[in-house]
Amino acid sequence: MSKSEQMLAALQEQDLALADRYFEQALTTDSEEELLDLADYLESIGFFPQAKRIFEKLAPDYPASYISLAAIASDDGDLEQAFAYLEEIQPGSDWYVAALLAKADLYQLEGLPDVAREKLAQAAELTDEPLVIFGLAEIDLELGDFSQAIKEYAQLDNRSIFEQTGVSTYQRIGVCYASL
């Protein structure tokens, strides 16, 4: 049984002191894959300091960790640090589009929809993911660029988007036309 598994067992027993000892041991003895799984789980249950330590340790080799670190920093209200983590993901990385989307979310949180739109537009140039186009349409609707929003909503499969987001693109197109 790995130290990560022992830590999780200690958490189930609500023995936090023992869980902490196993956590410290896991950092030095468990495989990177085990640590990534542990970090993801710890993040999901709100053990952010421990998840952060693992992600920081593994981030140079696992760029997706920077996205998790940015989410933790954002949840802590440290948007500057969240942006710094996302800047670590370079344009050639498989995770670059995800970093752009995370940046767009952060800019939206900061009340900067124009900058958020720029990041989404950059992501849309790199992927044909429908949710990226949907995000662009939503921001264009918010910014009052109804003609552009209509074009973007029209590219999407209403059923698929509705299943993923609960939003009807048909309804959004209607709102845009009514606002022209």
Residue ranges and their predicted role:
Residues 1, 33, 64-67, 98, ...:
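Start-of-helix register in tetratricopeptide repeats
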Residues 12, 44-45, 75-76, 109-110, ...:
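Register position in tetratricopeptide repeats
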Residues 29, 58-61, 91-92, 125-126, ...:
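Structural marker of alpha-solenoid helical repeat scaffolds
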Residues 37, 68-71, 102, 135, ...:
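Canonical tetratricopeptide repeat
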